[in-house]
């Protein structure tokens, strides 16, 4: 058993960041931008690459407005045309791939036709795998200029192996998301200790990390940054918007959007190896407003951290207050 698993496990609700002296007059002075790959984005946040969260139209809007995105991989036959469409619009292309044999043919096709996406994410539930490592090496050989993220993983060993194979970033989180039931179906995962897993992985990482799953509040973004995330992937908080692909449903006068996990029966179209579920999330209006609110809250976080940009958050002190943060808010 590895020594780091003897440390105390904690998650987002268990942590509070400790304020430092503020050095800016207004939170508007705080810079929330982050460089990821060759590009700089407004905030360190990316909607989850799930079919109920992202589609072509939203990807276009995000890219046009300075946000990072990752297109899902559930219509594989459309991906090459998606890359072409984004490039025709003068925008960056960011796609997902799996590890099936057909994906190698797809990578060969992209290389041959010189349809080169700026970003690729290898999207596998258990990313610490010989087959993911094989795919990393293949993509970096065929598409060396593409920024490659691989995941999902949960341990420092996984970070080291995927980075050593050539991954430019790794994605941390096995089953902590609201629509994921991996921890219930398999007994494995980072549900309940996602933030601690991120902390452990960050100690081994030499390249960027994406924290994926378990985000319930905007303040969790700052906590993710504190514990090593360059980007924070969010599903359920983004699924309820006008621009979200899920169907809009009204129940007793209240509006909801459909949201489902990538390994759900809805996504797979069959009851086979299901590790996700479907749910309804409250309708939240335009995603523009949510992204603006996230940026403003992150600016406030920077001001509390006593700095002018995200780097200040990475070095603040923190306290563990087991399950007591929201006692006064319930």
Swiss-Prot record:
PROSITE patterns: IMP_DH_GMP_RED. It comes from the Bacteria. NADP(+) binds at residues 209-232. Its EC number is 1.7.1.7. The keyword NADP applies. Keywords: NADP, Oxidoreductase. One of its GO terms (molecular function) is GMP reductase activity. HAMAP family: GMP_reduct_type2 (MF_01511). This is GMP reductase. The lineage of its organism: Bacteria, Bacillati, Bacillota, Bacilli, Lactobacillales.
């Amino acid at each position: 058993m590895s020594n780091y698993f003897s440390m105390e496990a904690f998650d987002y609700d268990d942590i509070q960041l400790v304020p430092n002296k503020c050095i800016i007059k207004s939170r508007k002075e705080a810079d929330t931008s982050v460089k990821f790959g060759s590009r700089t984005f407004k905030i360190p946040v990316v909607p989850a690459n799930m079919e109920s969260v992202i589609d072509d139209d939203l990807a276009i809007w995000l890219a046009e407005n300075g946000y990072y995105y990752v297109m899902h991989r559930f219509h594989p036959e459309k991906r090459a045309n998606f890359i072409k469409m984004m490039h025709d619009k003068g925008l960056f292309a960011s796609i997902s791939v799996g590890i099936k044999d057909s994906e190698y043919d797809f990578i060969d096709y992209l290389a041959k036709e010189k349809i080169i996406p700026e970003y690729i994410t290898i999207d596998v539930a258990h990313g610490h795998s010989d087959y993911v490592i094989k795919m990393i090496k293949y993509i970096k050989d065929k598409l060396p200029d593409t920024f490659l993220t691989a995941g999902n993983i949960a341990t420092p060993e996984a970070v080291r192996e995927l980075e050593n194979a050539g991954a430019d970033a790794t994605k941390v989180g096995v089953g902590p998301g609201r629509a994921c039931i991996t921890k219930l179906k398999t007994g494995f995962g980072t549900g309940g200790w996602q933030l601690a897993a991120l902390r452990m992985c960050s100690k081994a990482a030499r390249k960027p990390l994406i924290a994926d799953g378990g985000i319930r509040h905007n303040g969790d973004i700052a906590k993710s940054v504190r514990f090593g995330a360059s980007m924070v992937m969010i599903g359920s908080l983004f699924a309820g918007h006008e621009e979200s692909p899920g169907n809009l449903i009204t129940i007793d006068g209240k509006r909801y959007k459909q949201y489902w996990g990538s390994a759900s029966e809805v996504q797979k179209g069959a009851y086979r190896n299901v590790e996700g579920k479907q749910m309804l999330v409250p309708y939240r209006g335009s995603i523009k407003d949510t992204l603006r609110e996230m940026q403003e809250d992150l600016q406030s976080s920077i001001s509390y951290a006593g700095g002018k940009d995200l780097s200040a958050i990475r070095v603040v002190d923190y306290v563990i207050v087991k399950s007591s943060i929201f006692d006064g808010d319930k």
